[in-house]
């Protein structure tokens, strides 16, 4: 977002002084400060405060007669000793009550008003951190307050420190602001009680000095005086609120008296006089508030110092809440709207929090419509792209309050809902909370339309639809909203290909599933996996000719895309229940803890015993739809299969693995084959299934090898043209052989050499983007075959063959990295090369304890390999920066073109590209570390990436290079 402050137009009228200036032109709060303490606390670009407009005639002074023969001379040298002020000392003494301080001052004022006023002004100067004092000569001439303060300022500029009570970290000022606020509250209260607020000039005398100080070019004086004025205005607002309440009570009493059959004239006159006095006092307070708003707030709300701006905006929020009859109007709200574009994070955050309170106040809603239409676009922008995460989160909460008031259109609500896919977890979680509230309100409206919940359940209980749950309405609404969100981001072939690569290991959580995991934590209804499972399996949507049943069933009938989201909701529900409800203690120190662990294991076994039949039924139901079948298989990814120990689970597993075998051998969808492969690997961790699974996998591999030889045995794979029909067959066959090589050691197969040779020939084909998926499978299969190679301890005579086969694969990979037009295929070749090297070195380290043996062959990272890898990484960093819309930081000095793939600028693509860059960076740094080739130049290259591509990549670089 742009962090400059834009000038708001004044729709409500007002003079130039009431319009905000452009902060980016007038000041920079984040600019570096001078080494001089006086320059630190001096602002040359401040806006001078105008004097208060209201001045009453001054009565004769009471107290000691003083000769006014000379003005107080301000010395230029700093006094050697700290000037003592009893009020300041009392304020710092935590044992002295602030009310006692206020009462004591008024007692002094009654004895000698001029000395008391001078003492109070000196107290304010002490609060500013100013070791200067005025005397009664200065107090007597109020019109010269500004000139006197200017002399004081000139004398202290050279000696002033950056530290003053309001911002000091000194322990003696720990509760300074809190006690100062209490003192000012008691001070205003005593002014009102003693009638000085309405019938004396004492308040104006004090405020004339405070207003003058608020325009000081010295930051400590200006800040402290502004805080004084703002707090006094706050307590004037409270007093005004009390008067308004008294006026309302007196008015009711008067009306009641006038309606009596026997009118009491004395009582009526008394009430009229009371009302007149209240109105007079209220008018006085309103005049004070207007005067000090114009003379202090209008100038200080856009002060160069962010802390002053924050104080102004916070207090404005308090004033509006306290006396809306005075401050709740567009002419005051506009100041908050203008400051939504402030360059300072804290200021923007303060405004958002203040506004949220207004939108959550029912009595304010009607008066906020114009403000919303004028500033909601800016608030939505802050939610989506503000530079600070805290501001974004607070803005989303404000958007939710505005939505509740009915001030957001559907298209604007969708903008916020799209943030559930944001890359930042805090923003994502807050957006999911927003989503849950939208769903709840929509569902409540529908249930009210169809009748109460009890009425709906009673209607369904009279039918054969016994599995129905009213929660289905909520699940349906969630799926429909998420469909709208997901379809608002146009997917692309490149995105789908990248996603398929990183979903291969089964641990990659889709953005929708991640959002639903947050929803499960926010609302426990989404953890009802049994209700969701029954909903997934429900098929009876035929009309019953009864309302509201038909209307509800029609609403709950989902399309394939929505069903896919429902399956992801079920996956999130299962994962939440498995992870959150069954936490085994890390250590068991006693019998009771051991019994608790056993009970938890039994509960988990019971959960799996109930859950597996549902999953088997769901996979069988969705076997005809590749997308839904893939989502169904992913349900098992959410479960820790190693914890399934109950013997009763065996029959469910038997059905499951037979279904997986059928899906693996008969389905040509790549994701289905990959999903089955992952599940076979995970099921192998269950001891009771090992033998049966081994036989089943052997049978699958035998059939797959036969299929491979049939398709590729006599086919000229390197040069022949592949037709569309052949491509479909080859793609499925290669994906199956890829899965089989992950499951079983193929090094003993007699067909090993021909499989290896055919795959190498396939990688040597002329680049053709249409055939990329074939090469993806070939690369992955060769990686698995090399892994089995590395695990074997062959005779020395076989070492040459292994090196030759390894060299062939590496040459194919480097050829793809340097020459292939497909950037994603280049990425996969680079990842495979790095993973193979890491795997090889790990196997060697486990086979040989002699470190010298491992380090003998650290020649695998040849310069041409490293150059190719760095260019590929730099290309993806460029793409990440482009999609993420942040500056690109070069990694190499190469002039080769950067990676260009078809990805829109949206959170989905940004999240995926972050994953790509972090994955590639970590693997590259591991390989460079293993090769002992980290040079100072190389370290410098990667160190410069820190801070440019997000915290995750920076953490990876720090871990390896620090």
From Swiss-Prot:
Q: Name one GO molecular function term.
A: chromatin binding
Q: Which GO terms describe its biological process?
A: cell division; chromatin looping; chromosome segregation; meiotic sister chromatid cohesion, centromeric; mitotic sister chromatid cohesion; mitotic sister chromatid cohesion, centromeric; sister chromatid cohesion
On whether 4Fe-4S is a keyword of this UniProt record, the answer is no
Q: Which domain of life is it from?
A: Eukaryota
Positions of the SCD domain? 297-382
Q: Which UniProt keywords apply?
A: Cell cycle, Cell division, Centromere, Chromosome, Chromosome partition, Coiled coil, Mitosis, Nucleus
> Which InterPro entries does this one have?
ARM-like (IPR011989), ARM-type_fold (IPR016024), Cohesin_Scc3/SA (IPR039662), HEAT_SCC3-SA (IPR056396), SCD (IPR020839), STAG (IPR013721)
- Gene Ontology CC: chromatin; cohesin complex; condensed chromosome, centromeric region; condensed nuclear chromosome; mating-type region heterochromatin; mitotic cohesin complex; nucleus; pericentric heterochromatin
> Is Lipoprotein given among the entry's keywords?
no
Write out the ranges of the annotated region (Disordered).
Answer: 1-72
Compositionally skewed regions (Basic residues) per UniProt = 51-71
User: Record's Pfam families?
Assistant: HEAT_SCC3-SA (PF24571), SCD (PF21581), STAG (PF08514)
- Where does this protein reside within or beyond the cell? Nucleus; Chromosome, Centromere
Point to the regions of Polar residues compositional bias: 21-30
Which portions of this protein are annotated as coiled-coil regions?
A: 236-275
This chain's function reads: Component of cohesin complex, a complex required for the cohesion of sister chromatids after DNA replication. The cohesin complex apparently forms a large proteinaceous ring within which sister chromatids can be trapped. At anaphase, the rad21 subunit of the cohesin complex is cleaved and dissociates from chromatin, allowing sister chromatids to segregate. The cohesin complex may also play a role in spindle pole assembly during mitosis.
Q: How does it assemble?
A: Cohesin complexes are composed of the psm1/smc1 and psm3/smc3 heterodimer attached via their hinge domain, rad21/scc1 which link them, and psc3/scc3, which interacts with rad21. Interacts with swi6. The interaction with swi6 may contribute to recruit cohesin complex to heterochromatin.
Protein family: Belongs to the SCC3 family.
Q: Provide the protein name.
A: Cohesin subunit psc3
What's the source species for this entry?
Answer: Schizosaccharomyces pombe (strain 972 / ATCC 24843) (Fission yeast)
């Amino acid at each position: 977002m742009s962090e400059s402050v834009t000038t708001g137009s004044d729709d409500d009228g007002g003079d130039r002084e009431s319009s905000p200036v452009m902060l980016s032109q007038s000041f920079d709060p984040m600019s570096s400060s001078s080494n001089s303490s006086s320059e630190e606390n001096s602002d040359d670009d401040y806006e001078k405060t105008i004097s208060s407009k209201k001045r009453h005639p001054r009565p004769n002074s009471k107290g000691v007669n003083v000769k006014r023969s000379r003005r107080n001379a301000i010395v230029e040298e700093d006094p050697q000793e700290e000037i003592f002020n009893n009020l300041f000392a009392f304020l710092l003494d935590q044992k002295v009550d602030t009310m006692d301080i206020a009462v004591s001052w008024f007692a002094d004022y009654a004895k000698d008003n001029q000395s008391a006023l001078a003492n109070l002004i000196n107290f304010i100067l002490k609060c500013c951190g100013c070791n200067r004092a005025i005397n009664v000569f200065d107090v007597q001439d109020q019109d010269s307050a500004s000139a006197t303060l200017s002399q004081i300022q000139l004398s202290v500029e050279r000696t002033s420190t950056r530290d003053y009570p309001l911002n000091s970290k000194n322990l003696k000022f720990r509760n300074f602001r809190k006690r100062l606020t209490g003192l000012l509250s008691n001070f205003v209260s005593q002014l009102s009680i003693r009638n000085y607020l309405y019938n004396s000039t004492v308040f104006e005398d004090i405020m004339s000095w405070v207003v003058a100080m608020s325009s000081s070019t010295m930051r400590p004086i200006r800040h402290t005086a502004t805080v004084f004025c703002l707090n006094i205005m706050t307590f004037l607002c409270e007093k005004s609120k009390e008067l308004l309440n008294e006026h309302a009570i007196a008015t009711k009493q008067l009306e009641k008296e006038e309606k009596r059959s026997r009118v009491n004239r004395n009582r009526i006159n008394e009430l009229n006089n009371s009302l007149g006095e209240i109105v007079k006092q209220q008018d006085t307070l309103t005049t004070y508030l207007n005067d000090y708003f114009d003379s202090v707030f209008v100038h200080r709300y856009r002060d160069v110092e962010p802390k002053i701006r924050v104080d102004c905006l916070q207090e404005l929020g308090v004033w509006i809440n306290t006396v809306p009859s005075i401050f709740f109007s567009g002419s005051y709200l506009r100041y908050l709207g203008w400051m939504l574009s402030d360059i300072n994070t804290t200021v923007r955050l303060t405004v958002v929090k203040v506004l949220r309170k207004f939108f959550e106040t029912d009595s304010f809603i009607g008066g906020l419509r114009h403000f919303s239409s004028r500033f909601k676009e800016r608030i939505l922008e802050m939610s989506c792209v503000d530079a600070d995460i805290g501001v974004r989160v607070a803005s989303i909460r404000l958007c939710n309050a505005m939505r509740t008031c009915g001030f957001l259109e559907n298209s604007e609500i969708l903008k916020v809902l799209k943030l559930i896919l944001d890359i930042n977890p805090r923003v994502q979680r807050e957006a999911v909370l927003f989503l849950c509230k939208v769903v709840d309100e929509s569902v409540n409206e529908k249930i009210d339309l169809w009748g109460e919940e009890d009425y709906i359940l009673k209607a369904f209980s009279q039918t054969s639809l016994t599995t129905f749950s009213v929660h289905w309405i909520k699940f349906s609404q969630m799926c429909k909203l998420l469909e709208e969100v997901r379809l608002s981001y146009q997917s692309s072939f490149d995105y789908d290909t990248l996603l398929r690569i990183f979903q291969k290991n089964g641990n990659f959580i889709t953005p929708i599933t991640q959002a639903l995991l947050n929803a499960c934590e926010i609302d426990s209804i989404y953890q009802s996996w049994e209700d969701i499972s029954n909903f997934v399996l429900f098929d009876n949507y035929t009309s019953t000719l009864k309302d509201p049943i038909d209307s509800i069933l029609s609403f709950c009938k989902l399309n394939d895309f929505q069903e896919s989201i429902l399956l992801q909701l079920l996956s999130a529900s299962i994962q939440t229940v498995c992870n959150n409800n069954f936490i085994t203690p890390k250590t068991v120190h006693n019998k009771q803890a051991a019994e608790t662990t056993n009970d938890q294991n039994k509960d988990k076994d019971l959960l799996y015993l109930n859950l597996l039949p549902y999953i088997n039924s769901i996979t069988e139901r969705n076997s005809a739809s590749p997308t839904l079948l893939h989502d169904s298989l992913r349900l098992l990814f959410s479960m820790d299969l190693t914890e399934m120990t109950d013997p009763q689970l065996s029959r469910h597993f038997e059905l499951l693995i037979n279904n997986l075998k059928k899906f693996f051998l008969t389905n040509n969808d790549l994701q289905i084959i990959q999903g089955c492969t992952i599940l076979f690997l995970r099921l192998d961790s269950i001891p009771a299934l090992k033998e049966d699974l081994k036989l089943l996998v052997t049978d699958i591999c035998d059939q797959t090898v036969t299929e491979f030889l049939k398709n590729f045995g006599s086919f000229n794979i390197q040069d022949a043209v592949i037709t569309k029909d052949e491509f479909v067959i080859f793609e499925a066959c290669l994906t199956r052989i890829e899965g089989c090589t992950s499951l079983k050691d193929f090094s003993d197969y007699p067909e090993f050499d021909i499989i290896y040779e055919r795959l190498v020939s396939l990688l040597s084909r002329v680049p053709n983007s249409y055939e990329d998926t074939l090469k993806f499978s070939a690369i992955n299969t060769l990686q698995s075959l090399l892994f089995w190679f590395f695990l074997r301890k062959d005779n020395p005579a076989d070492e040459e063959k292994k090196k030759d086969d390894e060299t062939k694969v590496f040459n194919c990979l480097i050829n793809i990295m340097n020459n292939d037009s497909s950037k994603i295929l280049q990425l996969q070749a680079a990842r495979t090369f790095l993973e193979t090297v890491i795997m090889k070195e790990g196997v060697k380290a486990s086979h040989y304890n002699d470190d010298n043996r491992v380090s003998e062959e650290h020649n695998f990272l040849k310069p041409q390999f490293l150059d190719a890898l760095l260019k590929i990484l730099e290309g993806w960093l460029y793409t990440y920066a482009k999609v993420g819309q942040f500056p690109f930081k070069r990694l190499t000095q190469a002039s080769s073109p950067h990676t260009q793939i078809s990805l829109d600028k949206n959170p989905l693509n940004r999240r995926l590209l972050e994953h790509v860059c972090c994955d590639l960076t970590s693997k590259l740094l591991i390989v460079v570390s293993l090769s002992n080739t980290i040079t100072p130049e190389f370290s410098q290259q990667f160190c410069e990436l820190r801070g440019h591509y997000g915290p995750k990549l920076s953490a990876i670089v720090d871990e390896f290079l620090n």
